[in-house]
């Protein structure tokens, strides 16, 4: 674990790494911050305050022994808001408590799923980020106790045949992590004001798709290689541009993300 960074008048000089029993110092002129949801904490080691925040994104895995969902379907996404399917009796119970009444309200779009595993697998992976308020990252992530039930009901609204599993799906496996994002949902890639320091982060909801190109762009910055014409679009210094600040007024943290 990086516990400290040595910075002199010429920029980065060393990195301190803490192990379970001891600590070592590595002499270096380059330091890349690619700490995912801990981008802010890592930046603070060199006095940087990155304009990022984190959203908690979860997923569930459950079995489909009845074969409601064909194994060869692609990733499927529901793009309309919806209300969760409940029986009249369930509605009455939920309506009777301030703690559960929100489950009767309209939920945002975005529930999606795909089959997981090879031949013989019955596993379905499903995701729905219906709560996108910023959160401080903790490990392990803590999910809403009702998350799995809500996702399954959202899928039943999308695929009515899945309603056979409501209340009968056993205990779905819940996992997930954080989306680190900037205000306009555009990554940070490039050099920092501290000489020798670089950042690659805030890849948000398209990290898998953008990671290869992001890594190549970062490598060009670090090695001093030729940069593509779009490189300035990802620099931290973009926030110093008055015209860019005006653009931010019409963008939000879901830009470019399903």
What positions do the PLM features span?
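Flavin (primarily FAD) binding-site architecture
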Residues: 33-48
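Short beta-strand segments that buttress and anchor functional surface loops
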Residues: 14-19, 202
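C-terminal lid/capping helical subdomain adjacent to the catalytic/cofactor pocket in oxidative enzymes
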Residues: 192-258
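Core beta-strand elements of the Rossmann-like FAD/NAD(P) dinucleotide-binding domain
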Residues: 20-30
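Active-site lid/adjacent beta-loop-alpha segment flanking the redox-cofactor pocket in flavoenzymes
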Residues: 65-195
């Amino acid at each position: 674990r990086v516990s400290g960074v040595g910075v002199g008048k010429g920029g980065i000089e060393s990195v301190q790494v803490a192990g379970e029993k001891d600590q070592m110092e590595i002499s270096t002129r380059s330091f890349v911050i690619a700490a995912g949801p801990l981008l802010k904490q890592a930046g603070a080691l060199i006095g940087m305050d990155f304009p990022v925040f984190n959203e908690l994104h979860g997923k569930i895995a459950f079995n489909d022994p009845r074969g409601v969902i064909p194994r060869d379907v692609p990733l499927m996404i529901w793009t309309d808001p919806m209300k969760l399917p409940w029986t009249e009796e369930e509605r009455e119970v939920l309506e009777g408590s301030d703690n559960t009444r929100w489950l009767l309200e309209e939920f945002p779009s975005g529930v999606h799923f795909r089959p997981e595993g090879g031949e013989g697998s019955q596993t379905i992976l499903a995701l729905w980020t219906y709560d996108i308020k910023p959160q401080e990252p903790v490990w392990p992530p803590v999910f809403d106790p009702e998350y799995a039930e809500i996702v399954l009901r959202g899928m039943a609204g999308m695929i009515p045949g899945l309603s056979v599993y409501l209340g009968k799906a056993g205990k779905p496996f819940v996992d997930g992590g954080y989306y680190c994002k900037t205000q306009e949902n555009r990554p940070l890639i490039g050099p920092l004001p501290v000489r020798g320091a670089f950042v690659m982060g805030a890849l948000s909801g398209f990290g898998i798709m953008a990671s290869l190109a992001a890594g190549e762009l970062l490598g060009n910055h670090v090695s001093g290689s030729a940069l593509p014409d779009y490189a300035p679009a990802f620099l931290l210094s973009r926030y110093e541009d008055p015209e860019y600040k005006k653009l931010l007024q019409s963008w939000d943290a879901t830009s470019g993300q399903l």
